């Protein structure tokens, strides 16, 4: 247990100095957790080009390039050469590539080989904070009162995962990133979305309607309760049109057997839509507000030096210098 805690202390993130580091940035020579890796490399396009790879499970100091399926660990080239000598050269190993940019949570899942770990299968799954007795006890058989405790379901396993010995920590940090990314939360949208140029008829104006060939037809029963056919005819026969109505904004409504007096016909019902001038005004208002926000930010902008790795600055200030340069450890 103490050895494992000491091993984790060697893998602390160089940016936050609190979380377990999982990736290694070669350009910065820094060990980073997933959250700090995204925070550091999302700053600008130059930082996003830095190549990163998973941190070696053996030395905790170098980027890994191989995955040993026998030991279930990721190794750098030197550690791979030391571990897989003649006695263990038969271990099944495969190379894997690192990544650049700022990948999203689904892209990181694909990189480390956890493609099947989706939102439904356990990425956002957590143990409930309060568990009732009914959730943990199930009946042992019908008619008896033998009960047995059930365990919390484990996380799904993936045999093709290449995240090494720190798979649980990888899943935990990915779960934290998924909460901050709105794209990971999948909300189901309704199948039929109302378009900006259409208005659907109120449902209380109809009786029980049957769906035939994608069109809604009036019911043949209780025709006296529905004077809607005459209303549609009056709208179609009248030459007057409401103001600010586009010519293309009309809906085809098939009418059948209404009051036994109207033959089957198609009536054009005008629908009021928003004009292009209103859209142009809204766009201009949004543009003006964005420009004003930019000017306010420009006034309060301060050009200060930002320290990316504070722990390195503290170590640099404590080291001895000779003529402005760092002295070697062997020098007096």
Curated annotation (Swiss-Prot):
GO MF annotations, alphabetized:
DNA binding; DNA-binding transcription factor activity; transcription cis-regulatory region binding; zinc ion binding
Q: Where are the zinc fingers (B box-type)?
A: 13-55, 56-96
Query: Where does this one sit in the cell?
Result: Nucleus
User: Which keywords belong to this entry?
Assistant: Metal-binding, Nucleus, Repeat, Zinc, Zinc-finger
Highest taxon of the lineage: Eukaryota
What name does this protein carry? Zinc finger protein CONSTANS-LIKE 13
Q: Which InterPro entries match?
A: CCT_domain, CONSTANS-like_Bbox1, Znf_B-box
| A Pfam family | zf-B_box
Residues where Zn(2+) 2 binds: 56, 59, 79, 84
Q: Which family does it belong to?
A: Belongs to the CONSTANS family.
- Give the record's GO CC terms: nucleus
GO BP? circadian rhythm; regulation of DNA-templated transcription; response to blue light; response to far red light; response to light stimulus; response to red light
Q: Which residues form the CCT domain?
A: 287-329
The top of its lineage is:
Eukaryota, Viridiplantae, Streptophyta, Embryophyta, Tracheophyta
Indicate which residues the UniProt annotation says bind Zn(2+) 1.
Answer: 13, 16, 36, 41
Source species: Arabidopsis thaliana
């Amino acid at each position: 247990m103490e050895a494992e805690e000491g091993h984790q202390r060697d893998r602390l993130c160089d940016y936050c100095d609190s979380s377990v580091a999982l990736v290694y940035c070669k350009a910065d020579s820094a060990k980073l957790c997933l959250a700090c890796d995204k925070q550091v490399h999302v700053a600008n396009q130059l930082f996003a080009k830095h190549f990163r790879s998973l941190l070696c499970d053996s030395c905790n100091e170098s980027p890994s390039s191989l995955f040993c399926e026998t030991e279930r660990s990721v190794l750098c080239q030197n550690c791979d050469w030391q571990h897989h000598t003649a006695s263990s050269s038969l271990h099944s190993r495969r190379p894997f590539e690192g990544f650049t940019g700022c990948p999203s949570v689904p892209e990181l899942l694909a990189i480390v080989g956890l493609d099947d770990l989706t939102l439904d299968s356990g990425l956002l799954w957590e143990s409930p904070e309060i568990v009732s007795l009914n959730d943990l006890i199930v009946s042992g058989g019908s008619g008896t009162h033998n009960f047995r405790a059930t365990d919390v379901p484990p996380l799904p396993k993936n045999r093709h995962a290449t995240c090494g010995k720190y798979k649980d920590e990888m899943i935990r940090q990915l779960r934290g990133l998924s909460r901050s990314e709105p794209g990971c939360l999948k909300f189901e949208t309704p199948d039929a979305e109302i378009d900006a140029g259409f208005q659907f008829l109120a449902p209380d104006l109809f009786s029980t309607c049957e769906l035939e060939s994608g069109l809604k037809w009036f019911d043949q029963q209780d025709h006296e309760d529905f004077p809607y056919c005459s209303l549609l005819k009056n709208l179609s026969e009248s030459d007057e049109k409401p103001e600010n109505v586009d010519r293309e904004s009309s809906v085809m409504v098939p009418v059948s057997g209404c009051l036994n007096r109207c033959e089957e016909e198609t009536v054009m019902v005008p629908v009021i839509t928003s004009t292009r001038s209103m859209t142009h005004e809204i766009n201009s208002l949004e543009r003006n507000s964005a420009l004003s926000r930019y000017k306010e930010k420009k006034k309060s902008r301060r050009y200060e030096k930002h320290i990316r790795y504070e722990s390195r600055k503290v170590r640099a200030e404590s080291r001895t210098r000779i003529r402005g340069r760092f002295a070697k450890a062997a020098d007096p």
